[in-house]
Amino acid sequence: GEPFNAEAVKFTFDRLLGEEGARGPQRSNYTAISHVEVIDDHTVDFFLYQPDPVLLTKLAGYGAMIVPPNYIKEHGDDYFNTNPVGTGPFQVVDYTPRSDVKLEAFADHWGGAPKLDSVTYRFISEPSTAVAELQSGRVDIVLPPTIPIGMIKSINDHPNTEVVSVASPTVEALRFNTQTGITADERVRQAII
């Protein structure tokens, strides 16, 4: 592996905001960022074109995973895009676009080996197929939003499956365009909320 440090963060955002980032869907989430400067080994400063009130939320997800600079420089962007390396407790062992990704436990993970030996994520976009796979035991879990609310009863009524609801740190929010259009008027935004 290589260090997860400020240089890696800068490299990640230089890449995301540069030519390679233009090829993917995540760049649009970070258009407020002008550039990133390294302060020390574990600190960076983000310089913005304009305020972005949800930037911290975006940095916690939305494709802001920090990438390994040396690995990408050695193998190239195209290779990395189908053979990714990260900081998690699993390693990608196989990836078939629009089908599945297979992961195996990384015994030398800095946080210790995970409790599972392997995990396979299958990309099933058709709800009835996902439910059939769940009820037959070919998949262990199906996550929202794959399953419409109307199918919950059939899952609960099946002897091999159950619906489990868990609290999550999800935040529902309205984001207004404050630059143009009707929501540029503060009174309109206040009336809505």
Regions found by a protein language model. Name each.
Residues 5-13, 29, 55, 106, ...:
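Stable alpha-helical elements in mature extracytoplasmic
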Residues 14-22, 51-53, 60, 64, ...:
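Sec-exported extracytoplasmic/periplasmic mature domains
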